[in-house]
């Protein structure tokens, strides 16, 4: 995490086990990752300081565009003007920081709650909600509007397999619970739509949004989104689809061979027996999916397995 300078509040991808790259993003400094340790540790002071530092991460978007290498709409950042960021990895990281500050009743909790409320309202007002993919954020008024690619809010469609695997489901579900009856109108429905349609059929996606989402991945990870939708809508059909995504799509399979491979020579400093087929991404997303699926739709598991 960068603690000073123009990139303060952003994280750098990799940079621990091997060389870093030019990805400087909020998804890497995501406060949600630190939240659980903070509480389990009884309020670790250093983590508390870091959570406070990350409250101003929204200001960095006027200096550095995290999507600069793949952006096609011509937008470039400028300090003190509206800034573009994604509704997945970027907004979820900013929202997590604001949510934690509100939750902790920190010195800026009212500001944080207002930023959260305003941006939630902005997402709800987008024609396609989270499916829009990104938006323009005003760091002065703390409001969120349509993205540069769709200034008239006609209904942009931009879905990434990464949007919901960096804390977004956890942050959104907590925010909805915290706001309760005060949640801005339309936001829960916008989230339910994303949860349902991410792995709906191409025909369903096209009927709802005019186009399909194309080829996606991380369906096991996203099974927890379908599980959330099934729970909220009390829909057993969606629940069974969620379990199918969990057991029979990608990620860790129940019948996978749990073998190790001996690695030595110039590949490692010390010889080691390694599960080379096991990826940390799969393990992390599998764990989250297990926890959330069982919390939301455990009553339908026997029906799926039978």
Label the model's feature ranges.
Residues 1-305:
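Catalytic cores of extracellular degradative/oxidative enzymes
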